[in-house]
From Swiss-Prot:
Cofactor: how bound: Binds 2 Zn(2+) ions per subunit.
Subunit-structure text: Monomer.
Binding of Zn(2+) 2, residues: 108-109, 191, 235
Gene that encodes it: Y2-aiiA
Name of the protein in question: N-acyl homoserine lactonase
Source species, domain of life: Bacteria
Cofactor(s) essential for the protein: Zn(2+)
GO molecular function terms noted in the UniProt entry: acyl-L-homoserine-lactone lactonohydrolase activity; metal ion binding
EC number: 3.1.1.81
Known outcome of mutating residue 194 to A: Activity decreases significantly
Catalytic reactions on record: an N-acyl-L-homoserine lactone + H2O = an N-acyl-L-homoserine + H(+)
């Protein structure tokens, strides 16, 4: 079975210090990076990958003021970037979704998880546990009483949607290998690799464990060599220019 449609859905932007994208650079310049959600239409039902930024980021570039990330991360979010608004735009309500896949629980990927009180949220155990105590996780991204489906390691969500365990950027990060009807195999690295440079040249970037992150990149490179998918990176400004976004699909 294959995924009928894979939509790239813009979910705002985030100003991030260039040293977070390339750790060899000195801090000081902010880059204007895209934030993405991905909608998969499958035979079993619609699946949403990541939920964007939290409500607290709407028109609030100072979200991280007084924290470890002050001046390093500036969210650029409007009401139109709220996950419920995004879903309405693409024709769904929260209760329509079969699953939420949380690649990881950072603020720009899991900020909207609270909109889904009943939908199963698929998350790696290592990520769920780390988010309980590590300072880089906002409370909106690890709300109690949601319907978490906790997994460990690689996992097939439905036929054609494979989760690949790629820790490093965060303790329990996961990427996706998706078989689509239109474009064949697609690899979403998500934040296992922000950019093509991180991936192809193994340029280090921000994260929990740089050695583990590099191991995950090497693992994904092996997947690419074997499976020959189209590869999309998590926050690549140059790649964004050529991305087909909703209502187009791949």
């Amino acid at each position: 079975m294959t995924v009928k449609k894979l939509y790239f859905v813009p979910a705002g932007r985030c100003m991030l210090d260039r040293s977070s994208v390339n750790s060899t650079l000195t801090p000081g310049n902010l880059l204007n990076l895209p934030v993405w959600c991905y909608l998969l239409e499958t035979e079993e039902g619609p699946i949403l990958v990541d939920t964007g930024m939290p409500e607290s980021a709407v028109h609030n570039e100072n979200l991280f003021e007084g924290t470890f990330a002050e001046g390093q991360i500036l969210p650029k979010m409007t009401e139109e970037d709220r996950i419920v608004t995004i879903l309405k735009r693409v024709g769904y309500k929260p209760e329509d979704l079969l699953y939420i896949i949380s690649s990881h629980l950072h603020f720009d990927h899991a900020g909207g998880n609270g909109a889904f009180s009943n939908t199963p949220i698929i998350i790696q155990r290592a990520e769920y546990e780390a988010a309980q105590y590590r300072e880089e996780y906002l409370k909106e991204c690890i709300l109690p009483n949601l319907n978490y489906k906790i997994i460990e390691g690689d996992y097939e969500v439905v036929p054609g949607v494979q989760l690949l365990y790629t820790p490093g950027h965060s303790p329990g990060h996961q990427s996706l290998l998706i078989e689509t009807e239109k474009s064949g195999l697609v690899l979403l690295t998500i934040d296992a690799s922000y950019t093509k440079e991180n991936f192809e040249d193994e340029v280090p970037f921000a994260g929990f464990d740089s050695e583990l992150a590099l191991s995950s990149i090497k693992r994904l490179k092996e997947v690419v060599m074997k499976e020959k998918p189209i590869v999309f990176f998590g926050h690549d400004i140059e790649q964004e220019k050529g991305c087909k976004v909703f209502p187009e699909y791949i």
